[in-house]
Swiss-Prot record:
Pfam families: Aminotran_5
SUPFAM superfamilies: PLP-dependent transferases (SSF53383)
Gene encoding the protein: sufS
Protein species of origin: Escherichia coli (strain ATCC 8739 / DSM 1576 / NBRC 3972 / NCIMB 8545 / WDCM 00012 / Crooks)
InterPro entries associated with the record: Aminotrans_V_dom, Aminotrans_V_PyrdxlP_BS, Cys_dSase_SufS, PyrdxlP-dep_Trfase, PyrdxlP-dep_Trfase_major, PyrdxlP-dep_Trfase_small
Keyword terms: Cytoplasm, Lyase, Pyridoxal phosphate, Transferase
Position of the signal peptide: none
Active site per database record: C364
The protein's name: Cysteine desulfurase
Subunit structure: Homodimer. Interacts with SufE and the SufBCD complex composed of SufB, SufC and SufD. The interaction with SufE is required to mediate the direct transfer of the sulfur atom from the S-sulfanylcysteine.
Protein's job: Cysteine desulfurases mobilize the sulfur from L-cysteine to yield L-alanine, an essential step in sulfur metabolism for biosynthesis of a variety of sulfur-containing biomolecules. Component of the suf operon, which is activated and required under specific conditions such as oxidative stress and iron limitation. Acts as a potent selenocysteine lyase in vitro, that mobilizes selenium from L-selenocysteine. Selenocysteine lyase activity is however unsure in vivo.
Reactions that this protein is recorded to catalyse: (sulfur carrier)-H + L-cysteine = (sulfur carrier)-SH + L-alanine; L-selenocysteine + AH2 = hydrogenselenide + L-alanine + A + H(+)
Family from the record: Belongs to the class-V pyridoxal-phosphate-dependent aminotransferase family. Csd subfamily.
Length: 406
């Protein structure tokens, strides 16, 4: 099918509103994407006419809600090409998924003297859980350093591995720089050293196809809200053999087989033993609608459109005086920048006055900010509903700010 950005934009109600008397240019989808009417309506319809608690309910509404929820698990498994739907755990988002791995697999497999490898470009969600695990067990956290162009110093990676390396935890795409890491070679190297690999896919799954079997990663995690779905829902993929060995990290209803005050508790099988309590069923069903929406458009079509838009944006931004861009020329989704010596908050505030929404701050990547010796950056992110005209408005806005502030 031919990708039509105008038709896509018509599906997103919020894109028709104004901000400060001007049409909204929403360039903040890397933080959280807007939702198409199809997602909003599907979740609302569930709450209006189909809501019930899932699992163990004998009545019709409960059985139907359970079936819908489990169908989304199957749908998500196809979306990332997992071998089985039972390799997928519903989580609140990428952060919870990584914490689940750290507290379940990590507590069982990482010991004093072991080490975990991350990179200098990671989001805090892929740093802090590993820092906490290492502190608990006496393990070492090793870091792949950055190059100035926003790529990793991959030549250092072989020197970081040894017989005590248990995990490589790496982002698929940097949320600040847009760098897409060469996962295939990194995963192969990790497996050659007997280490497992966790991939933070929060900034990847909306931009192009992801095939977890082809990647051969052990864990892959992403959030629904960045994929045009609801907040509070995400997916953790774990290879089946690993998942079956992992102990639960939260206790409660739905994750048990038996509970006895005298004989203790036994767990149900994976993935359900990692889904304690009442799930976010509405969010899960909304995620299913988002997956259906994106799949119907075609991720290859989306990728082609977004890459053309990114190339246009980078070329047009060259006309802005005193603009510093961070990250490689070949990138996905995001453009981080600073304008002269002006603080990112000031630049972002001016852009907001022009109806342009960008993200400002450290972007949950303070080690990366420290590497570039800046307290903050502005970040414009480009999604499938953004346009060349919105890029032009961003460029014009930055030129105007430069004239005003010098």
């Amino acid at each position: 099918m031919t990708f039509s950005v105008d038709k896509v934009r018509a599906d997103f109600p919020v894109l028709s509103r104004e901000v400060n008397g001007l049409p909204l240019a929403y360039l903040d989808s890397a933080a959280s994407a807007q939702k198409p009417g199809q997602v909003i309506d599907t979740e609302a319809e569930f709450y209006r006419h189909g809501y019930a608690a899932v699992h163990r309910g004998i009545h019709t509404l409960s059985a139907q809600a359970t079936e819908k929820m489990e169908n989304v698990r199957k749908q998500a498994s196809l979306f990332i090409n997992a071998r089985s739907a039972e390799e997928l755990v519903f989580v609140r988002g990428t952060t919870e998924g990584i914490n689940l791995v750290a507290n379940s697999w990590g507590n069982s497999n990482v010991r004093a003297g072991d080490n975990i490898i991350i990179s200098q470009m990671e989001h805090h969600a892929n740093i802090v859980p590993w820092q906490m695990l290492c502190a608990r067990v006496g393990a070492e956290l090793r870091v792949i350093p950055l190059n100035p162009d926003g790529t990793l110093q991959l030549e250092t990676l072989p020197t970081l591995f040894d017989e005590k390396t248990r995990l490589l935890a790496i982002t698929h795409v940097s949320n600040v720089l847009g760098t897409e890491n060469p996962l295939a070679e990194m995963i192969t190297l990790a497996h050659q050293h007997g280490a497992k690999v966790l991939v933070d896919g929060a900034q990847a799954v909306m931009h192009h196809l992801v095939d977890v079997q082809a990647l051969d990663c052990d864990f892959y995690v992403f959030s629904g809200h960045k994929l045009y779905g609801p907040t509070g829902i995400g997916i953790l993929y774990v290879k089946e053999a690993l998942l079956q060995e992992m102990p639960p990290w939260e206790g409660g209803g739905s994750m048990i087989a038996t509970v006895s005050l005298s004989e203790g508790t036994t767990w149900t099988k994976a993935p359900w033993r990692f889904e304690a309590g009442t799930p976010n069923t509405g969010g899960i069903i909304g995620l299913g609608a988002a997956l259906e929406y994106v799949s119907a458009l075609g991720l290859n079509n989306i990728a082609e459109y977004e890459q053309n838009l990114m190339h246009y944006a980078l070329s047009q931004l060259e006309s802005v005086p005193d603009l510093t861009l961070y990250g490689p020329q070949n990138r996905l989704g995001v453009i981080a920048f600073n304008l002269g010596k002006h603080h990112a908050y000031d630049v972002g505030s001016f852009l907001d006055n022009y109806g342009i929404a960008v993200r400002t701050g450290h972007h949950c990547a303070m080690p990366l900010m420290a590497y570039y010796n800046v307290p903050a950056m502005c970040r414009a992110s480009l999604a499938m509903y953004n346009t060349h005209e919105e890029v032009d408005r961003l460029v014009t806005g930055l030129q105007r700010i430069h004239r005003l502030l010098g």
